[in-house]
């Protein structure tokens, strides 16, 4: 009986630790509505919050969204999860609010590998995303500008040769009409 109680106590005490050790679930793909909202330019670079209108001086930053687009390791092959995320993006880009705009598709990598390798890989991945949107959602190529950023513009600054999933991403920037 004592062994059973001790074993049960260990299992209960270890359950929270085991839960923490599990890999985090992939973040759900943003909805097309969320993407349209994030990528739609605000009028005159102004915003209204609780009745206060804030007008930004100078040029406002272009609306953009950072997406986790999964690729097979070391390749530009889209995973099923990536296609799900890009499905939301493709639907959003066909929305009338965004239909006349052009978009820069920025591919980013982490710092694993040489800078030249990461630059080439990020360019391939940006082109893969643009091609998928063109072929699957009939987004005209003229509306998409794939650009490889390599390991420049890290979301999470890391030393060289550090794998960091949050740095392997695609950023979509609205360039306007």
Predicted regions and their residues:
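N-terminal targeting leaders that direct proteins to extracytoplasmic destinations
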Residues: 1-61
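Periplasmic OmpA-like peptidoglycan-binding domain that tethers envelope proteins to the cell wall
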Residues: 108-177
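Glycine-centered loop/turn motifs
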Residues: 30, 74, 160-161
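Secondary-structure boundary/capping positions in well-ordered alpha/beta enzyme cores
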Residues: 18, 100, 140-142
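Conserved beta-strand core positions
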Residues: 69, 101-103, 144, 170
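Extracellular/periplasmic catalytic domains that process cell-envelope and extracellular macromolecules
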Residues: 58-63, 97-98, 163-166
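Periplasmic peptidoglycan-binding/anchoring modules of Gram-negative envelope and division proteins
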Residues: 71-106, 131-135, 175-177
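Acidic/histidine-rich, surface-exposed loop or edge segments in extracytoplasmic proteins
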Residues: 62-74
């Amino acid at each position: 009986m004592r062994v059973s109680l001790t074993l049960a106590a260990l299992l209960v005490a270890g359950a929270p630790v085991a839960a923490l050790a599990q890999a985090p679930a992939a973040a759900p793909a943003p909805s097309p509505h969320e993407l349209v909202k994030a990528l739609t330019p605000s009028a005159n670079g102004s915003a209204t919050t609780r009745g206060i209108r804030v007008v930004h001086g100078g040029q406002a930053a272009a609306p953009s969204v950072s997406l986790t687009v999964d690729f097979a390791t070391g390749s530009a092959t889209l995973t099923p999860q990536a296609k799900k995320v890009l499905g939301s993006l493709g639907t959003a880009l066909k929305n009338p609010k965004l239909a006349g705009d052009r978009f820069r598709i920025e591919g980013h990598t982490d710092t694993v590998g040489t800078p030249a390798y990461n630059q080439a890989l990020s360019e391939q991945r940006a082109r893969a995303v643009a091609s998928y949107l063109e072929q699957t959602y009939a987004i005209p190529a003229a509306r998409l500008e794939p650009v490889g950023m390599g390991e420049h513009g890290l979301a999470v600054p890391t030393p060289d040769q550090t794998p960091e999933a949050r740095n392997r991403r695609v950023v979509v920037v609205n360039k306007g009409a």
